[in-house]
């Protein structure tokens, strides 16, 4: 697998990775006035469903999706109201390409627990894939509004990418800038923010992010090519030559190398 494809796959997996972690005994209350559910409060059926879901999570993380799905079904047969099981079922269906079933599962998880930020994020990202951008934004905002949510950078990134796909460059820049503020070392954030800034004609800021990215081990054909395009727009021939040498040396068979050889800077 090429480094470019690995980067793209890592991006897609990263956007959902934190959502497949095993649920803990203590769970977020469904409303701000509800108390936290701790181990002593946990009914027997809920405990059994949680253990099944934890087992399913292990299978899911090993790539054994159908086995995980079977465990999830047993968890939900025990306790149909256990939101984390519905969220994990959505991830399993998503991996299997069952977009409609995945959407139904994420929606059920959010309905059961409106403060399940991971499920809201997943539903938002799936809606983005389905080009339902308005609903995607609703769910991203829901996730970001949950107090104590620890994956805000991931959601701001997804929201920014989704806004860019919808054609709202200003909103994309705002979300991606927030993602960068929270996670400045993330190469996917840097690349997508630079791409949006380039599209808006803000070449100096795009250059800043690409200098950091292309000077790191995370540089790939896409980031180098974008860097070349930025330097070309800024009239920096030395920068163009330097990045072009890197692209030809490190990614000689890439589509970006072919564009460089054609001088197709505006494709």
Label each PLM-derived region with a short phrase:
Residues 19-73, 77, 261-267:
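N-terminal leader/linker segments that initiate helical-solenoid repeat arrays
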Residues 27-40, 215-267:
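Terminal, low-structured helical/coil segments at or just beyond the last alpha-helical repeat
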Residues 44, 78, 112, 146-148, ...:
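Structural marker of alpha-solenoid helical repeat scaffolds
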Residues 48, 82, 116, 150-152, ...:
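Residue-level recognition of tetratricopeptide repeat
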Residues 85, 119, 126, 153-155, ...:
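TPR alpha-solenoid repeat register
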């Amino acid at each position: 697998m090429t480094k470019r494809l690995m980067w793209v796959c890592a991006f897609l997996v990263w956007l959902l990775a934190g959502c497949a972690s095993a649920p803990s005994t203590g769970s977020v209350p469904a409303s701000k006035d509800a108390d936290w559910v701790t181990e002593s409060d946990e009914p027997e059926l809920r405990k059994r469903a949680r253990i099944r879901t934890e087992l399913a999570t292990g299978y899911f993380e090993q790539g054994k999706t159908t086995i995980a799905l079977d465990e999830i079904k047993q968890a939900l047969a025990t306790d149909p109201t256990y939101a984390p099981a519905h969220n994990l079922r959505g991830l399993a269906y998503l991996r299997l390409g069952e977009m409609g079933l995945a959407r139904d599962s994420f929606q059920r998880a959010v309905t059961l627990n409106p403060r399940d930020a991971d499920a809201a994020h997943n539903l938002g990202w799936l809606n983005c894939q389905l080009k339902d951008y308005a609903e995607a934004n609703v769910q991203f905002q829901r996730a970001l509004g949950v107090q104590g949510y620890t994956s805000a950078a991931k959601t701001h990134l997804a929201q920014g990418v989704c806004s860019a796909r919808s054609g709202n460059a200003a909103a994309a820049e705002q979300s991606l800038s927030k993602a960068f503020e929270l996670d400045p070392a993330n190469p996917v954030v840097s690349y997508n923010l630079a791409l949006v800034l380039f599209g808006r004609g803000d070449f100096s800021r795009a250059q800043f992010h690409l200098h950091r990215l292309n000077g790191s081990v995370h540089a790939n054909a896409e980031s180098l090519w974008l860097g070349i395009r930025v330097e070309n727009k800024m009239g920096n021939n030395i920068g163009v030559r330097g990045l072009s040498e890197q692209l030809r040396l490190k990614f000689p068979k890439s589509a970006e190398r072919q564009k460089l050889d054609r001088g197709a800077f505006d494709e």
